[in-house]
Amino acid sequence: MLVLKVQFLVMIFIAYLFADIPDVLNDIDGDTINLKELTTQKTVAVITMKSPDCPVCQTQILRIMQNFDKLSACNVTFLVLAPGPIDELQKAKELTKFPFPFIVDQNLKIARSLDLIINETQILPSILILNDKLEVEWTQRGRNALYFGDPELMKRLKCEGWI
């Protein structure tokens, strides 16, 4: 019970910090994403990558891709947030064939505001769900080769039974 209370307080704190994110972002392909508008249309899940070449992070994206048909029924869209450089993140996008926007977190500004900094060049791998006020409504922090957080994500999205 104490763990749940602590997680709840952390989520409230993170949500407060995330309110400073811009309504509009640009992805690595130069496309503009109106995040404010997007969150009113769909559930927005942000997948953070430790680095563009993080194999566990790439596997997380591939796991989501393998179950995309089931996820599409959940009215969810994804954004991938990672440190640069852009060309390395472009390689990760091509490798995973993930059809959603990849965003370079310049100077790790967004990750820093979410307290997701491992060091000055890496982001803590996580999954975040945003609400229409651009606040973090749900978060799953951390990922490793044995644990991806998929069951929690699917439960939150009400898309259980996909794994």
Question: Language-model segments: which ranges?
Answer:
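Sec-dependent signal peptide recognition
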Residues: 2-11
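Hydrophobic h-region of N-terminal signal peptides that target proteins for export
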Residues: 11-19
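A short beta-strand-turn-helix
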Residues: 24-44
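Short hydrophobic alpha-helix segments
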Residues: 36, 114, 138-140
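Short active-site neighborhood of thiol/selenol oxidoreductases, capturing the structured segment around
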Residues: 38-64
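Structural microenvironment flanking redox-active thiols in thiol-disulfide oxidoreductases
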Residues: 58-97, 108-112
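Structural micro-motif
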Residues: 98-100, 116-128
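Thiol-/selenol-based redox modules, centered on thioredoxin-like
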Residues: 124-163
